[in-house]
Amino acid sequence: SRRQRQICIRDRQVDTPQNLYQKPGNLFVAGFMGSPQMNFLDAVISEKGGNLIAKVGDHELAIPAAKAKALKDGGYVGKTVVLGIRPEDIHDSQMFIEASPSAPMTSVVKVYELLGAEVFLYFDVNGTQVTARVDPRTTAKTGDPIKFAFDMEKSHFFDKETELTICN
């Protein structure tokens, strides 16, 4: 698009396409911008060892300090929020998984979609379908178990009731 600014009239967010994508003001904008759209998972914010974690089912995801501060200051500890993660921020490379502060998550690939320079993997996390955009050199195929990790530095958190962004 050649436009410098886009307007999401429904939700009154006026910004550059890049900012709408990277810093959505609410769930609608987050889901509207990008293809495939952002993945949304319910997460309970908890404290563990002085740090905040997002619990998605049995998975505990370490929350980066700046996001943890916003969640804590907003009174979200002990509450369910919506965790948003873009498909390109889910990684199946061993190097990323080993460097992740959270334990790797596991699932089974339901669909493998090769698009040339990228691959989309579709699988479930805690009963919710998730889409990951990964390197085409991935060895994962339909039916394979997969280990993956979220890049929590690029995660988004939304208030479950108001659907407004808590932090990007």
Where are the predicted features?
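ABC ATPase "signature
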Residues: 13-15, 23-26
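Structural detector for short beta-strands of small beta-barrel domains
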Residues: 36-48, 101-112
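Short, conserved beta-turn/loop elements at beta-strand boundaries and strand-helix junctions
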Residues: 47-51, 112-119, 160
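Short acidic-hydrophobic catalytic motif
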Residues: 18-22, 30-33
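Residue-level detector of high-confidence beta-strand sites
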Residues: 13-14, 112, 168
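Single conserved hydrophobic/aromatic residue that forms the stacking wall/gate
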Residues: 1-11
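A residue-level detector for short acidic-glycine micro-motifs
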Residues: 45-47, 89-92, 111-113, 136
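Glycine/charge-rich catalytic "coupling/switch" loops of P-loop NTPases
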Residues: 22, 51-108, 129, 139-168
